[in-house]
Design a protein with these regions (language model features):
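Secondary-structure transition/capping motifs at alpha-helix termini
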Residues: 254, 258, 284-288, 315-320, ...
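A generic structural motif
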Residues: 99, 449-451, 595
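C-terminal beta-signal and terminal closure region of outer-membrane beta-barrel proteins
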Residues: 558-611
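Short Gly/Pro-enriched loop/turn and capping motifs at secondary-structure junctions
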Residues: 301, 538, 550-554, 587, ...
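Small/polar, glycine/serine/threonine/aspartate-rich low-complexity segments that form flexible
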Residues: 260-272, 497, 555-572
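C-terminal outer-membrane beta-barrel translocator/porin domains of Gram-negative envelope proteins
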Residues: 396-555, 560-562
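Periplasmic polypeptide-binding modules associated with outer-membrane biogenesis and secretion
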Residues: 2-274, 278-282, 293-313, 406-407, ...
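Gram-negative/organellar outer-membrane beta-barrel architecture
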Residues: 92, 101-110, 126, 137, ...
Length: 611
């Protein structure tokens, strides 16, 4: 009956008197350790459950490979014999990485020995061994190997060698998966989302390759590079099981952004009269991450255009070489022929316009064999052809100004300028947008080839060096950003022929602040220096105190026609002031108010830091 079953279940276990406790297989300290952990004692009663608990307690010490208990009846009571087999003395711990045949593993043997060497020469203790395994797994985590772990530790040889089997998280493949705006990999019909970007554009930015051990730190850098392409709203990683369960497929999930835009406008200006403009931008042309930009302006007086194509990484190139091709027809007011205390214009009272028609190509590559490591040096090489002409507001040629000075090198108002260009940049800044530590060196050489009108032979040399020092002059900005001192010195010279419009213009927002654009001077050579103290105000607003100095080194008169001299530009200028920087998606918006050594003051606007 149910009542009888409950009484049987509640009946206590039989208890027997222990006459003797014997340990077989262990002596000395191990025998003492067993007696320390067991509860069974001679002269006391015991039960089957207590004997099993003693077996478990002996196992829990970690010193034994097998433990059994054998009770026997004797005239004095039950003799309880614990039969044990001690572990061998630990001599060595080796690692077996799976899957088998893996050419390398990331766990150095030295790390293994450092963890387990305190146990060498002692009887293997499985509890201490497990503590060491926990440290091994933590080493993997600390070094970014999040998928790696010890999966088996059961192989122990009689001579004391323990073999740990580890699965380190081998990458079987890298795949790309496109997600919709909601982050789903399929559409309403259950079909996979098809992206515009070609897979290799993404995977070539990923350092992880099939056969590598997955590493979190490497994967994070890979994600930053893919996101840095500028064509995705979101980039993330997921995992899928490989065909071999001991391998993993790394999936790069991307959400594409709209990379194309078109705009149109119309207006009226004194330079172009009534005009209309159309512009087009595409950042991911053909799904190749290539950029195409074009702008056309049609006016009553001029047709202007500017088209540019950039491939940021030539397909198949192992060194991340890029190139840019551009064609243009641009018109601008020249700073060389404008400003100053003495206005010198054209005979008809117009200001000279510089019209440039031409195009060129530039190749750029980082000087590093490892495309996944930021290169200190970047080099560029290119050529450009321009037909340069000096014109008035109506687009008519204007070879001389009102004082009879030639405005072109040929004297006809037209010059042909074919140049080869070489540049090198060494970037050691900690942040390209808001640097507070490091330096930036720029070197440039431009060599013309005499062709066409003017047959110009010139060599232009330029250099610029910036240095950044983190400081803490005040404490009220603590936690809002980094304070820094920023210094820049630059200079240049032109050897050989010099068309006047190619002189170095000094003064303005990118030169000596406090002066209007180009109002300091125009020289064959120049030196310019700036010192700034940059500090945060709130999280998105910063401030700056600055001092600028620029000089043409007395070379203004060596420019054909002496355009700076006839306009009474001083040739040397000093400016100082203060400004604010407002962070925006376009970069820091720079607003500076400068005072010149001539007693003038001026407000300057710009995008990005001066240097």
């Amino acid at each position: 009956s149910p009542e009888t079953q409950e009484q049987q279940q509640a009946a206590p276990e039989p208890r027997v008197l222990v006459g003797e406790v014997v340990i077989t297989g262990a002596t000395g300290q191990l025998e003492d350790e067993i007696f320390r952990v067991i509860s069974t004692r001679a002269g006391q009663a015991t039960t089957r459950s207590q004997l099993q608990a003693d077996v478990n307690a002996i196992f829990a010490t970690g010193f034994f490979a097998s433990v059994d208990v054998k009770p026997e009846d004797t005239p004095l009571g039950v003799r309880v014999t614990f039969l044990v087999q001690p572990n061998p003395v630990l001599r060595n711990v080796t690692i077996n990485a799976v899957p088998e045949g893996l050419e390398r593993r990331v766990l150095p043997q030295q790390v293994v020995d450092n963890i387990f060497s305190p146990q060498y020469g002692q009887i293997l203790n499985l509890r201490q061994l497990q503590e060491g395994i926990t440290k091994l797994n933590q080493w993997y985590k600390d070094n970014g190997y999040d998928l790696a772990q010890v999966v088996d530790a059961s192989k122990v040889t009689p001579d004391g060698t323990v073999t740990l089997t580890v699965a380190e998280g081998v990458v079987e493949d890298i795949r790309v998966r496109f997600l919709n705006k909601e982050g789903q990999p399929t559409n309403e019909k259950g079909e996979p989302i098809r992206g515009r970007t070609r897979d290799f554009i993404i995977t070539r930015e990923v350092q992880l390759k099939a056969g590598d051990i997955f590493n979190r730190q490497t994967a994070e850098r890979d994600l930053r590079r893919v996101f840095g392409l500028g064509i995705f709203n979101d980039v993330r990683l997921s995992f899928a099981p490989g065909t071999d369960p001991r391998r993993v497929v790394v999936v790069v999930d991307v959400i594409e952004k709209n990379t194309g835009s078109i705009a149109a406008g119309a207006g009226i200006s004194s330079a172009s009269g009534l005009f209309g403009s159309v512009s087009y931008q595409q950042q991911n042309l053909g799904g190749n991450n290539q950029t195409l930009g074009a702008e056309v302006q049609v006016g009553q007086r001029e047709l202007l255009f500017d088209a540019r194509f950039t491939d940021p990484w030539i397909a198949g190139d192992p060194y991340r070489t890029s190139y840019t091709v551009n064609f243009f027809r641009r018109r601008s007011i020249s700073l060389i022929f404008d400003g100053g205390d003495n206005e010198v214009e054209l005979e008809n009272g117009d200001r000279p316009r510089i019209l440039r028609l031409g195009g060129g190509v530039t190749f750029t590559r980082p000087l590093s064999r490892d495309v996944f490591t930021k290169a200190e040096w970047t080099a560029s090489l290119g050529f450009q052809y321009q037909r340069v002409s000096i014109r008035d507001a109506d687009g008519e040629l204007a070879p001389q100004d009102e004082e009879g000075n030639d405005l072109s090198f040929s004297g006809t108002g037209k010059d042909d300028l074919l140049t080869l260009q070489f540049g090198a940049v060494r970037d050691l800044r900690n942040d390209p947008l808001r640097p507070s530590r490091g330096s930036l060196l720029r070197l440039g050489v431009e060599q013309s080839i005499p062709v066409g009108e003017g047959s110009i032979l010139l060599t232009r040399l330029r250099a610029s060096y910036s240095y950044y020092i983190p400081v803490r002059f005040t404490n009220f900005t603590k936690g809002k950003g980094v304070q820094a001192l920023a210094f820049n010195i630059q200079g240049g010279t032109v050897l050989g022929d010099l068309p006047p419009y190619e002189a170095f213009a000094l003064g303005g927002s990118s030169s000596v602040r406090g002066y209007d654009e180009g109002d300091v001077g125009a020289g064959r050579s120049y030196i310019q220096a700036t010192a700034e103290y940059r500090f945060p105000i709130i999280s998105v607003v910063g401030g700056a105190l600055f001092v600028d100095f620029g000089t043409d080194l007395g070379s203004g008169s060596s420019v054909p026609g002496d355009p700076a001299g006839v306009r009474d530009k001083p040739g040397t200028g000093l400016g100082f002031g203060l400004g604010v920087r407002v962070q925006s998606p376009l970069g820091p918006i720079r607003v500076d108010y400068g005072f010149s050594d001539q007693g003038d003051s001026r407000l300057h606007f710009g995008i990005g830091e001066r240097f």
